[in-house]
Design a protein with these regions (language model features):
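Signature of N6-adenine DNA methyltransferases within the class I
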Residues: 1-133, 149, 153, 157, ...
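Generic beta-strand/beta-sheet core signal
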Residues: 9, 39, 59-60, 139-141, ...
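Short, glycine-/Ser/Thr-/acidic-enriched flexible segments
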Residues: 13, 64, 142-145, 152, ...
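Short, ligand-facing micro-motifs at secondary-structure edges
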Residues: 38, 142-153, 179-192
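Short, well-ordered beta-strand micro-motif
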Residues: 56-60, 163, 203
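Non-catalytic DNA-recognition/assembly elements of restriction-modification systems
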Residues: 90-123, 206-295
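Extended, non-catalytic structural segments that build the interaction scaffolds
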Residues: 156-165, 249-254
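Basic, amphipathic alpha-helical recognition segments used for DNA target recognition
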Residues: 160-201, 208-228
């Protein structure tokens, strides 16, 4: 009925999937106001027995075009967590102007809205990708709080290789290793897989020759550090792994270098010092909790 309110608990894919674009169009064409709050299953489920990432969708069916699409960040269950306090203090922000195809950003604060607006004004990463050239290899699955981006393969079944013009490859690999890139991934993805669309929709700022050189050197420093901190784990006959050993990255140990990357690139996107600090500290309670694993 007109002006009826409905609420659903749904998988978080509602915010982050090509296949849900049709549902988005249906809602945006018929509901004047929509609210979506999102909740992670890691490090612990926010809702007991809800062992998947979830969203709560609330909308008012008005048979008119959407005027406000309100979203929240993806909430996690941390120390001193209180569910009632969370529910009473959900922070929504209008993200109607920041929707991508099948993707509704999971943000809560005006500072995030400002940052995302600036990032989206830059050139799409997909416009730099070539059929051949210098490789950048990224993990499209795994890596809960940090993503693994290298210029070489680790023979993982969950890695994908893309190619760039030689002068851009390492600088782009550096940018993709940043806190800013992780934040963009978190807000637009299902937090399980780094899909082609989300990867290609990340934005790259204008870079002069000096900046390209700085990013190149910083990326080489970063790669050296993550390899130094990596562990080689041996498996046994009872293991579910089908290899005798595998490399386990501890990317969090390189956080100080990652922060240096953001100090360099965030001003290129037009971010202020306050906005850069927000990005560097985004979800830091969980990212540096020791639970991280990038095998």
């Amino acid at each position: 009925c007109r002006n009826g309110n409905m609420a659903y608990i749904v998988p978080i894919a509602l915010t982050s999937s090509d296949s849900l674009a049709g549902i988005h169009n249906l809602l945006l064409s018929n509901c004047e106001d929509i609210h979506i709050s999102s909740y992670s299953v890691r490090p612990q489920p926010v809702f007991k027995n809800a062992v998947v990432n979830t969203s709560i969708l609330l909308f008012r069916k008005t048979y008119s075009t959407c005027e406000h699409l309100y979203s929240t960040k993806m909430y996690r269950k941390g120390r001193h967590f209180n569910l009632q306090s969370l529910v009473d203090n959900l922070k929504f922000i209008d993200v109607k102007d920041l929707v991508l195809y099948g993707r509704i950003p999971k943000i809560s604060f005006s500072i995030e809205h400002n940052i995302l607006t600036k990032v989206l004004s830059k050139k799409r990463l997909g416009e730099y990708i070539k059929a051949e050239g210098s490789p950048i290899v990224y993990r499209f699955a795994g890596g809960r709080y940090f993503k693994v981006i290298t210029n070489y393969s680790n023979s993982s079944s969950a890695e994908r290789t893309v190619y760039f013009e030689d002068k851009f490859a390492n600088p782009i690999g550096c940018i993709l290793s940043s806190n800013l890139s992780f934040w963009f991934y978190q807000i637009y993805s299902d937090n399980l897989n780094w899909k082609n669309y989300e990867f290609s929709e990340f934005r790259i700022p204008d870079m002069n020759d000096e900046t390209l050189e700085q990013l190149e050197l910083l990326y080489l420093e970063y790669l050296s550090d993550i390899e130094h901190n990596a562990n080689i784990r041996q498996t046994n006959d009872d293991s579910s792994y089908k290899v005798s050993s595998f490399k386990e990255y501890k990317i969090g140990k390189s956080k100080s270098i990652i922060d240096k990357i953001d100090d360099l690139i965030c001003p290129l996107y037009g971010l202020t010092k306050e906005e850069t600090k927000f990005i560097k500290n985004y979800d830091i309670e969980f990212r540096l909790s020791g639970e991280e694993e990038n095998s």
